[in-house]
């Protein structure tokens, strides 16, 4: 049985969210199918999701959540070592609607179940309804028999922050201070909420993300912790890049920051793609009222930063771009003791996200 914990917070109970670079038990994903977000009835992106799941499963068990109508299709496409479970959903962004797990020193596992409103609710959310997505975290906790903390008064997505597991949280002002999330809360209120639910002492604020139209600037496209005291940050000197200003600002800010332990951050540069990834007019994407349209020429958020660290591996986006190999080399330098695996995820980018967005790790508690 999985219960809701009322009246206390993870910090009060001695739980913390570990860094992504710490040991993991499994990775959750959600099978894509929306024809108003994914081109050609989601068939191309289902291949990409399958390839991502295969890459992850070399290092960590994968559980794929799938709707009733897609269960048999997903089970057929995915390898036998990927567990497939039927769970209703509105779309496939488990990083944002799934649970953010926390652990304690006794080897126990719990989770944060954030309120999810499709990245902005009725202000600037990407689709409606989102009610099934908002239940995903609770259902995962039931499946895993994990007690959870529900934040009915606080909207948050897992892709909007990174933690180092040692008291530091990295996020962006563009996202967490956006009107469609928690307009009733001050910046200080939001900081306190993060500190209580992630067991943190210090919040590091970047300015803008690189996807204002999608998620209001999630940090996982811009920067992440790669080890205690070390971060990676996207970097480009190409002033024509749509990511230039945000990348330069983030890099400058990070180089001036210290973490919760007082360490000056070591900042690793990660290249941006040489060419923009864009929506093509021949893509067959359904138009549905209430869903953000994807139109010819739209620039997609193709960032190498949206990788997943999972046990002895790091799964890195690839785009068929001339900078693909450089990105893999740079990530390998950040993680000399891990295997770096590139997966072409351009089909995922067409739908507004990438590898980190479509995965959620369950840390090893013991």
UniProtKB/Swiss-Prot annotation:
Enzyme Commission number, as recorded: 3.5.3.12
Disulfides per UniProt: none
Catalytic function, reaction form: agmatine + H2O = N-carbamoylputrescine + NH4(+)
Superkingdom of origin organism: Bacteria
Active-site residues per Swiss-Prot or TrEMBL entry: 357
EC category: hydrolase
An example Gene Ontology molecular-function term: agmatine deiminase activity
Key words of the record: Hydrolase
Gene3D superfamilies given in the database record: L-arginine/glycine Amidinotransferase, Chain A (3.75.10.10)
GO-annotated biological processes: putrescine biosynthetic process
InterPro entries per UniProt: Agmatine_deiminase, Peptidyl-Arg-deiminase_porph
Matches recorded under Pfam families: PAD_porph
SUPFAM superfamilies named in the record: Pentein (SSF55909)
PANTHER family reported for this sequence: AGMATINE DEIMINASE-RELATED (PTHR31377:SF0)
Protein family per UniProt: Belongs to the agmatine deiminase family.
HAMAP family linked: Agmatine_deimin (MF_01841)
Protein name per the record: Putative agmatine deiminase
Protein source organism: Lactococcus lactis subsp. lactis (strain IL1403) (Streptococcus lactis)
């Amino acid at each position: 049985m999985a219960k809701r914990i009322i009246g206390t917070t993870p910090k009060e109970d001695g739980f913390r969210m570990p860094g992504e670079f710490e040991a993991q038990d499994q990775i959750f994903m959600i099978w894509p199918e929306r024809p108003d977000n994914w081109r050609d009835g989601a068939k191309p992106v289902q291949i990409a999701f399958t390839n991502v799941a295969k890459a992850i499963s070399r290092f960590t068990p994968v559980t794929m959540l799938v709707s009733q109508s897609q269960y048999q299709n997903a089970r057929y496409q995915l390898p036998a070592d990927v567990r497939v479970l039927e769970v209703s959903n509105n779309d496939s962004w488990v990083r944002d609607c799934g649970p953010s797990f926390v652990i304690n020193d006794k080897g126990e596992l719990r989770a944060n179940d954030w309120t999810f409103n499709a990245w902005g609710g009725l202000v600037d959310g990407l689709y409606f309804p989102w009610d099934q997505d908002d239940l995903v975290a609770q259902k995962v906790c039931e499946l895993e028999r994990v007690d959870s903390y529900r934040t009915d008064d606080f909207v948050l997505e897992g892709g909007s922050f990174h933690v180092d597991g040692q008291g530091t949280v990295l996020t962006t002002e563009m996202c967490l201070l956006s009107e469609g999330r928690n307009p009733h809360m001050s910046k200080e209120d939001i900081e306190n909420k993060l500190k209580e639910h992630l067991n943190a002492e210090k919040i590091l604020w970047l300015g803008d993300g690189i996807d204002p139209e999608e998620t209001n600037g999630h940090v996982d496209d811009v920067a992440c912790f790669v080890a205690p005291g070390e971060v990676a940050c996207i970097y480009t000197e190409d002033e024509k890049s749509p990511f230039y200003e945000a990348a330069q600002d983030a890099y400058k800010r990070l180089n001036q920051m210290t973490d919760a332990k007082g360490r000056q951050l070591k900042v690793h540069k990660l290249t941006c793609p040489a060419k923009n990834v864009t929506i093509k007019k021949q893509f067959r994407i359904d138009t549905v009222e209430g869903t953000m349209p994807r139109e010819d020429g739209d620039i997609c958020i193709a960032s190498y930063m949206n990788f997943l660290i999972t046990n002895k591996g790091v799964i890195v986006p690839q785009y068929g771009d001339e900078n693909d190999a450089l990105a893999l080399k740079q990530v390998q330098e950040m993680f000399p003791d891990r295997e770096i695996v590139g997966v072409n995820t351009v089909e995922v980018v067409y739908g507004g996200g990438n590898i980190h967005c479509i995965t959620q790790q369950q840390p090893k508690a013991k």
